[in-house]
């Protein structure tokens, strides 16, 4: 604002900057942290979080062809991305903007490729994070409108406008109607990820709120450092 421009023209207070999409590894950690799943343990061996089967096979060379990805369990699934195992020839598939490892880079690149959405909308880490975020909100609030407002504020640090809240409510109602017609799909959604869901919560409402939370996590204002 004008006060900062006048009193801090050199931005020594770091009070302003251009907006940018956060790097993939930061986004993964951010999603886990929003859900309360991020493990803060420091140090240790590399970990092997969720990854599609044989996704590295086409890029393998020589003896790497026989490499079997030893999928992690327990807390290792939720460690910070800095501990994720890297192959010599290719990085984790959920980090589209990571270094190509052909040359040294002092900072990560940033991307807005549409392929990024394949991860943020479908990766088990993101779906599980959305599920736990929804669970946490359902345990703390009762009314649907309160739950949606809480989810939006929790992720974006902003209070939703009446128009935005109306969109969230409409999205929730649509998802709830879909799951009422196909309750087995709600069970499938809530089964994604290693951690078990809270069976005390109604499955249909939990699944609908999970989908809305996933949408909120994928908003531009969520994925972008303002």
Residues covered by each model-derived region:
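An acidic, gly/pro-interrupted, aromatic-rich
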Residues: 1-146, 195-226
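C-terminal structured "cap/appendage" subdomains that terminate the fold
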Residues: 138-210
């Amino acid at each position: 604002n004008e006060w900062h421009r006048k009193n801090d023209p050199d931005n020594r207070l770091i009070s302003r900057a251009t907006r940018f999409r956060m790097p993939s590894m930061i986004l993964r950690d951010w999603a886990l942290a929003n859900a309360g799943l991020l493990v803060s343990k420091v140090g240790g061996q590399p970990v092997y979080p969720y990854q599609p089967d044989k996704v590295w096979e086409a890029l393998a060379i020589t003896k790497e062809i026989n490499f079997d990805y030893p999928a992690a369990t327990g807390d290792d699934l939720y460690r910070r991305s800095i501990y994720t195992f890297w192959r010599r020839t290719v990085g984790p598939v959920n980090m589209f903007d990571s270094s190509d490892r052909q040359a040294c880079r002092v900072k990560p690149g940033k991307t807005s490729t549409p392929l990024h959405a394949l991860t943020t909308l479908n990766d088990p880490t993101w779906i599980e994070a959305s599920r736990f975020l929804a669970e946490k909100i359902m345990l703390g609030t009762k009314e649907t409108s309160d739950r949606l407002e809480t989810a939006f504020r929790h992720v974006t640090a902003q209070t939703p406008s009446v128009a935005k809240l109306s969109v969230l409510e409409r999205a929730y109602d649509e998802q709830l109607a879909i799951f009422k017609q196909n309750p087995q799909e709600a069970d499938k959604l809530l089964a994604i990820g290693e951690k078990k869901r809270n069976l005390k919560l109604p499955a249909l409402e939990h699944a609908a709120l999970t989908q809305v939370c996933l949408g909120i996590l994928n908003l531009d204002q969520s994925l972008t450092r303002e």
